[in-house]
Regions:
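Hydrophobic transmembrane alpha-helices and immediately adjacent juxtamembrane helices
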Residues: 1-280
């Protein structure tokens, strides 16, 4: 005969799938939650702004203008045979996607603390939805690039067909770095102050306003340890065509670092995921 006192103390614990296969099946089962979180974040971002989605166009456009004046007009840096605004904006697209993803991912778990602490679902859905929201901004900003191409009568070469490959690499870099920051920010809230600094510093050391070809040859391989360098160079190679060249050793190094970042990001996130509800 069961003891009522013992029965009253029993708890029901719902855990994530113990096997990797079950975990990814859980993500598919909860796909509607993923759609909801992504759509909610898109709506909230622009709902109470005066000009709405136009903010996704204004910020990269103004940054492009500043970089064009400083590096193209004043510093007279080479443009790889393309109009300087197109050179800059072909790098602004992946950089903005990457930097926005870091900012959104790092705070995504904290911002959904009530949901995470009360309901079981694969936590990977939360930062992934944040990256998808940043990708929507990326697609919107792409209209500026199309406008610049039309303005300068710039016609891309067949290389443009390889652009989806580099978009995939940018997505992997954003996810990998975002998962690390999202996981660390749950336990160490200092990262809410560190991430904006990392994003600002990353803009200065990445070839957004200039071509990476201006970096001295002896430093280019070391410079390519920055994973976003290979992504930006790939975007420019695909979009600009013509004189633009892809520094293959540096690109492969950046690609390897992106793969490492992506795989290790998923591994670490899965490792600490079960503690999120306790410490958040």
């Amino acid at each position: 005969m069961s003891n009522p006192k013992i029965a009253s103390q029993q708890e029901l614990v719902i855990e994530a799938g113990r096997t990797e296969q079950q975990y990814w099946k859980d993500i598919w089962r909860y796909r509607e939650l993923f759609y909801f979180l992504a759509w909610r974040d898109i709506v909230v971002r622009y709902k109470q702004t005066a000009i709405g989605v136009a903010w996704a166009l204004i910020r990269p456009f103004l940054t492009m203008v500043v970089f064009t004046v400083v590096f193209g007009q004043l510093a007279k840096l080479p443009s790889q045979g393309a109009p300087y605004p197109i050179l800059v904006f072909s790098a602004m697209l992946p950089w903005q996607f990457f930097s926005n993803s870091l900012s959104e991912c790092s705070n995504s778990l904290i911002g959904n603390a009530n949901l995470i602490s009360k309901v079981y679902f694969p936590r990977l859905i939360v930062p992934t939805s944040a990256v998808v929201v940043s990708f929507v901004d990326f697609l919107i900003s792409g209209m500026i690039l199309l406008g610049l191409m039309a303005w300068y009568n710039f016609v891309p070469t067949f290389r443009i067909l390889t652009l989806p490959l580099f978009i995939g690499i940018a997505f992997a870099a954003s996810m990998g770095a975002g998962l690390w920051l999202a996981s660390l920010n749950v336990k160490y809230r200092d990262f809410r102050y560190i991430v904006p600094f990392l994003v600002q510093f990353g803009l200065y050391i990445s070839p957004v306003g200039f071509s990476s070809s201006v970096v001295p040859e002896k430093w280019r391989l070391l410079y390519s340890l920055n994973p976003i360098v290979g992504v930006i160079d790939g975007f420019r190679w695909a979009i600009l065509g013509g004189e633009s060249k892809l520094y293959l050793p540096g690109f492969l190094l950046s690609l390897g670092f992106v793969v490492l970042l992506f795989v290790s990001g998923i591994w670490y996130f899965r490792k600490v995921e079960r503690t999120f509800a306790d410490v958040i």
